[in-house]
Amino acid sequence: NDAVQAEIDAAKAAMLTKPSKFVVFLVMFYAFLCMAIMYGAQQYTKAFGLSVCGLSEMQAAGMTSIYTIGSICAVLFWAFMMAKLKWSPLKVVLIDSVCTAVALAGVLFIHQVAIIYIAIAMLGFFAAGGALQTGLAVVQLFNPGPKGRNTGIYYTFMGAASYLIPVVAAQLTKASGEANAVYSLMIMLLVFAILAILSSLYLVAQHKKIFGKGAL
């Protein structure tokens, strides 16, 4: 316990100024944004491929496999980048958010099988491949405290997303039919990805203020 407390104290001592409540909220809210994108991409890309992009059942099923392969590759890749190149978790979160938005835009606006497959692999890589765990490292950076407490709050935001997305999807389907619903849902995920980019950029600016050095 003393060692844990010493680590927390050292992390707090490294700060030139205390992070605002808004900064602490943002690092936690990333869990909601990331989980919403991840859950939505996992559950609804196949339906999107079938009903919006006109893919065959076989092609749409392939999207799920490509997404999974992308996410497995990413876990290994980011672990290497952060361990070997000492990349800041905030830098990884920013890259993840930008590439997730690009991938979602690709899925939404370019209805060609090859482009959709590339975009889905990118989604798996950048949205699912360890982005949540990296976000938790950002929480510890800006809000040093007992890991159990921070993880608990972070998981609560994740839980809210995995509860909300199916509820929203069900309401949209009821209101406008499946094809319109999955399209609206993908637009919503793109908005979430853009919010994640804006949050990350704000945190990059705050990092300079709080720690006296750039995060990138």
Regions found by a protein language model. Give the residues of each.
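Intracellular juxtamembrane helix-capping segments at the cytosolic ends
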Residues: 129-143
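A late C-terminal transmembrane helix in Major Facilitator Superfamily
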Residues: 141-176
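Helix-to-loop junctions at the C-terminal end of transmembrane segments
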Residues: 74-88, 173
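Hydrophobic core of transmembrane alpha-helices in multi-pass small-molecule transporters
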Residues: 115-130
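Symmetry-related core transmembrane helices of the 12-TM Major Facilitator Superfamily/SLC fold
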Residues: 184-204
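Extracytoplasmic gate region of multi-pass secondary transporters
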Residues: 19-75
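Structural signature of the two symmetry-related core transmembrane helices
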Residues: 91-105
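Interfacial helix-cap and linker-helix signal at transmembrane-aqueous boundaries
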Residues: 49-50, 81-82, 168-179
